């Protein structure tokens, strides 16, 4: 949820943010009008309630002959107060409905535009020249099947399209990746957490995942619970309605969880293999930070992501995501995309978002200041490793015979294996 006070003071910032996202800037004006109506009606209700209390006291002090008239007046005022409260509640509901549609304010410097308007910040590593090496690279699914590591046919048989099994070397490779990610997180001072994958509606809504992209989320209607698409959701809810201590710096958690996504808007995209699937595993970084420290913490999360990409020796690029491609909670997002040889394109492997106070304001997560007051904190998140990395590791490190070289940084997590080769 955005800061209404800040929006009242500088509505042009909100309008500019909406335009950069490709959203309706008039939402800001409708929101401010609803806010003004609510505040006026709330003030009227509170004034009438105070007068009602005075009348109640007056009843007890009234002379016997005056008491019936005073009682009638008090009864009439009670009805007016009840009506005024209902008016204020309706205005609050209208305001809340508009607030739920208003995304976070985009940070300064974020490129405007949509999905294709990102800015490339840098390239790291050089893609292999397979033609110069004298062979045509196989895609990750062919490699995975030859290694008996990926089984999409049985995944589809058991669960439907976009499901799969990781078996043998595939399962070991994923566990190696995720354990390497946890070790990286521990070294960086994160507390590892195995999170719930089912959350309440208020937690899912508080993180911003029930807005425009609600169709991407699995819901268990009988229990009114949602399956998370990232442990970010559970970690954001971890300190909901709490005051956290940030006096020693950010609170950092690394969540390991299964993740579930409906991919409702992805019909026909990445249908081969395990690039875009309904279920996968991920280690997610999550930080609670002071607002003034959030931008620096965002750069730290990005740096830790890049360290892990270098550990597995992938050529990649870093992009500054355009405003129209940000989630509703994010003020800024950096993506790391690794080179995918068989498709000759970059594939997103990590993203890290600075959500400023947007999620914490909705979820009631605050810090106490020196003067005793409280304020919302900033929340940030970033992918450290996920199942999708297997795609790029197999393709970038393949040998002509279909075996796959294990990057040196992963070898300790695979029992010293230097190659993945079908037994």
UniProtKB/Swiss-Prot annotation:
Pathway: Aminoacyl-tRNA biosynthesis; selenocysteinyl-tRNA(Sec) biosynthesis; L-seryl-tRNA(Sec) from L-serine and tRNA(Sec): step 1/1
Keywords linked to the UniProt accession: Aminoacyl-tRNA synthetase, ATP-binding, Cytoplasm, Ligase, Nucleotide-binding, Protein biosynthesis
InterPro entries named in the record: aa-tRNA-synt_IIb, aa-tRNA-synth_II, aa-tRNA-synth_II/BPL/LPL, Ser-tRNA-ligase_type_1, Ser-tRNA-synth_1_N, SerRS_1_N_sf, SerRS_core, tRNA-bd_arm
GO molecular function, one term: ATP binding
CDD domains: SerRS_core
GO CC terms, sorted: cytoplasm
Subunit relationships: Homodimer. The tRNA molecule binds across the dimer.
Domain comment as written in the entry: Consists of two distinct domains, a catalytic core and a N-terminal extension that is involved in tRNA binding.
Protein name as annotated: Serine--tRNA ligase
């Amino acid at each position: 949820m955005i800061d209404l006070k800040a929006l009242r003071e500088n509505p042009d910032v909100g309008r500019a943010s909406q335009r950069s996202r490709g959203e309706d800037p008039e939402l800001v004006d409708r929101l401010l009008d609803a806010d003004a109506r609510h505040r006026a009606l709330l003030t009227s209700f509170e004034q009438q309630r105070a007068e009602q209390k005075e009348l109640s006291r007056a009843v007890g002090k009234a002379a016997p002959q005056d008491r019936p008239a005073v009682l009638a007046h008090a009864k009439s005022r009670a009805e007016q107060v009840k009506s005024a409260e209902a008016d204020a509640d309706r205005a609050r509901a209208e305001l809340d409905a508009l607030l739920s549609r208003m995304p976070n304010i985009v940070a300064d410097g974020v490129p405007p535009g949509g999905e294709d308007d990102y800015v490339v910040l840098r390239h790291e590593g050089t893609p292999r020249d397979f033609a110069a090496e004298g062979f045509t690279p196989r895609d990750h699914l062919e490699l995975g099947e030859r290694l008996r590591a990926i089984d999409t046919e049985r995944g589809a048989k058991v669960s439907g399209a976009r499901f799969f099994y990781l078996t043998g070397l595939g399962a070991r490779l994923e566990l190696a990746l995720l354990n390497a990610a946890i070790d990286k997180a521990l070294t960086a001072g994160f507390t590892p957490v195995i999170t719930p994958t089912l959350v309440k509606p208020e937690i899912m809504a508080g993180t911003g995942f029930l807005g425009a992209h609600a169709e991407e989320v699995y819901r268990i209607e009988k229990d009114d619970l949602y399956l998370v698409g990232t442990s970010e959701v559970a970690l954001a809810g971890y300190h909901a309605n709490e005051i956290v201590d940030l006096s020693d710096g950010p609170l950092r958690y690394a969540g390991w969880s299964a993740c579930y996504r409906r991919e409702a808007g992805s019909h026909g995209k990445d249908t081969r293999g395990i690039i875009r699937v309904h279920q996968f595993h991920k280690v997610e970084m999550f930080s609670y930070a002071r607002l003034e420290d959030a931008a620096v913490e965002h750069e730290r999360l990005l740096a830790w992501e890049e360290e892990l990409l270098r550990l597995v020796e992938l050529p990649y690029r870093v992009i500054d995501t355009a405003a129209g491609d940000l989630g509703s909670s994010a003020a800024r997002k950096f993506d790391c995309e690794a080179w995918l040889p068989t498709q000759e394109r970059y594939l997103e492997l990590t993203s890290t978002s600075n959500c400023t106070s947007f999620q914490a304001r909705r979820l009631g997560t605050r810090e106490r200041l020196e003067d005793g007051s409280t304020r919302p904190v900033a929340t940030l998140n970033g992918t450290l490793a996920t199942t999708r990395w297997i795609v790029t590791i197999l393709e970038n490190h393949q040998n002509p015979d279909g075996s796959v070289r294990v990057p040196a940084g992963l070898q300790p997590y695979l029992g010293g294996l230097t190659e993945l080769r079908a037994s």
